[in-house]
C-alpha cells in the first residue's frame, strides 16, 4: 500500500496536496483498495464553497456508493475531467492521474491539522 509523504490525509481516507494556492484532493490507496472497482465519480459541487468535512461528491463502485468529504474548507474549482470517461484511474493511480478535484483552501494552515503519512498508517493499521 502506498503512503506518499507529500500529501496530508483525513480519517475518512481522503488526501490533499497543496500546489501554490490550489490543492488537489483524492481518495487514498487504502480507500480505493477497500472500495474495489470504481465505475462512476460524481462531483456536483464544482464552483461551490464548502466547509471542512462536507460532502463534495460520491464514488460509485459495483456494490455501493460512498460519500467524499472535503478535507478542509474552501472552494471546489475543478473536477478531474479524465474521470468522466475513465473512473478506473482512481484505482490505478489514486495519488496522480486519479485525483478527484482541485480546490482553493479557505486557509492553507488548516492542512496542518490533518494527518501525515505516519499518522494515516496508524489509522489504517488500527
UniProtKB/Swiss-Prot annotation:
What role is this protein assigned?
The glycine cleavage system catalyzes the degradation of glycine. The H protein shuttles the methylamine group of glycine from the P protein to the T protein.
Cite the Lipoyl-binding domain residue spans from the record.
22-104
Question: What are the alphabetically sorted keywords of the record?
Answer: Lipoyl
- Cite a GO CC annotation: cytosol
InterPro entries given in the database record = 2-oxoA_DH_lipoyl-BS (IPR003016), Biotin_lipoyl (IPR000089), GCV_H (IPR002930), GCV_H/Fam206 (IPR033753), GCV_H_sub (IPR017453), Single_hybrid_motif (IPR011053)
Q: Which cofactor does it need?
A: (R)-lipoate
| GO biological-process terms attached to the record | glycine decarboxylation via glycine cleavage system
* Domain of life, per lineage: Bacteria
Describe its assembly.
The glycine cleavage system is composed of four proteins: P, T, L and H.
Q: Which HAMAP family match?
A: GcvH
Instruction: Give the sites modified to N6-lipoyllysine.
Output: 63
Tell me one Pfam family matched here.
GCV_H
Q: Identify this protein by name.
A: Glycine cleavage system H protein
Cysteine pairs forming cystine bridges in this chain are none
Amino acid at each position: 500500500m502506498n503512503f506518499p509523504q507529500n500529501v496530508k490525509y483525513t480519517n475518512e481516507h481522503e488526501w490533499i496536496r497543496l500546489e501554490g494556492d490550489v490543492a488537489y484532493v483524492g481518495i487514498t490507496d487504502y480507500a480505493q483498495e477497500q472500495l474495489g472497482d470504481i465505475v462512476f465519480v460524481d462531483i456536483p459541487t464544482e464552483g461551490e464553497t464548502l466547509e471542512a468535512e462536507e460532502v463534495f461528491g460520491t464514488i460509485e463502485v459495483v456494490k455501493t456508493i460512498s460519500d467524499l468529504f472535503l478535507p478542509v474548507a474552501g472552494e471546489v474549482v475543478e473536477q478531474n475531467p479524465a474521470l468522466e470517461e475513465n473512473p478506473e484511474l482512481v484505482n490505478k493511480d489514486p495519488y496522480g492521474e486519479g485525483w478527484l478535484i482541485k480546490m482553493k483552501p479557505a486557509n492553507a494552515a488548516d492542512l496542518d491539522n490533518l494527518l501525515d503519512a505516519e499518522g494515516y498508517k496508524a489509522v489504517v493499521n488500527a
